[in-house]
Amino acid sequence: MNIGLLGFGVVGGGVWELAQENRALNVKKVLVRREVPPLGETAVQDVEAILRDPDIDTVVEVLGGLHPAYEWICRALAAGKDVVTANKAVISAYYRELTALAHENGAALRCTAAVGGGIPWLVNLQRCRRVDTVTEVGGIMNGTTNFIMDAMARQGADFPAVLQRAQELGYAEADPSADIDGDDIRRKLTISANIAFDALLREEDIPAFGIRTVTGADMKDFRAHGFTCKLLACAQRTETGVAAYVEPALVAEGEPEAAVPGNYNLISCTGELLGRQSYFGQGAGRYPTAANVVQDCLDLLAGEDGFYTETARPMAVEADAVAHPYYVRTRTADPWLESVTADRWDSGVITGAVPVGQMLRWAAAQRQRDPGCFVAGIR
């Protein structure tokens, strides 16, 4: 396999290193922004040197971001080149366009590293789907937020201090919004649900509420009632669509998700025949992510196809099809909240079962009145 590698950052450097250990993988050219002496003549600064090279049969994209990654992936697929990417933003936003383009040109599109970092989640989800009807996918899909929630629960620390520590350790970006507001995990859920259900969901249709406003007092309240809080993604098959959403959730201390430490992930799928299967591991990092990129390349060599089918179709996102109780903390009185309140804890109230979509719409509106408002579903 002759590879054109787009990007030589943290993950790209890891891919290059791992590929050197496998004789079947020849990284012929690497797109870089500036000279990288160890790469020698392999390094190029013009993407055309890769996209127009007839000897390069596989393009590996690890640039990140939507553009120009999307345009370059499109050009590679249109030229009949297989594409391997770790770019969740591109795959989530343009899943329909990219899978169609790959199919039209007889090219493979693989993205195992886009969800779960080093966890072989998507390949095993695909294997489950081959023999069973998948009814639900989801779990802890973001290591940054799990690190924050775990540290707050274990150490009794407040959110700002733990976020700063996550940034110092390199787990959180300087601007952590994509992680703590739920955008990153929503992208991963979109990709997972599309593969699980042969769907064409759009990330903007999936409601999400993040952890930006959780407090140490909230966490103390949860612990006193036998819960811990995690940012969870969930997508369930319904009769007419998919109930998909992202929200903080109170998980009983004996449940598997409650025990997930630090920046680890725990992602699960449920099938009609196989029941629940879960995958645990590092959700990010140089070598875990690079390893899944290289695994995709090796799968292509073995004749494995890409993550798409001819039957993928648009499906309605129906977050209101699922209902459960919620913990709600807000300083602003609200008649609707009073009407659904069933119990009161020290820091907030507990509602009866409320449709997920309804609660997340209310929470988004309530944040305009009370920016510190926090909600969490109770599993």
Segments (PLM) and residue ranges:
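A conserved regulatory-domain signal marking ACT and ACT-like small-molecule sensing domains
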Residues: 297-379
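ATP-dependent carboxylate/acyl-activation modules
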Residues: 256-323
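NAD(P)-binding Rossmann-fold cofactor-contacting core
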Residues: 21-39
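Rossmann-fold NAD(P)-binding glycine/threonine-rich loop
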Residues: 70-75, 88-127
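Glycine-rich adenosine-cofactor-binding loop
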Residues: 2-17
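Substrate-binding/catalytic subdomain of NAD(P)-dependent oxidoreductase enzymes
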Residues: 163-266, 285
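Rossmann-fold NAD(P) dinucleotide-binding segment
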Residues: 45-86
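Conserved anion/nucleotide-ligand pocket segment
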Residues: 127-192
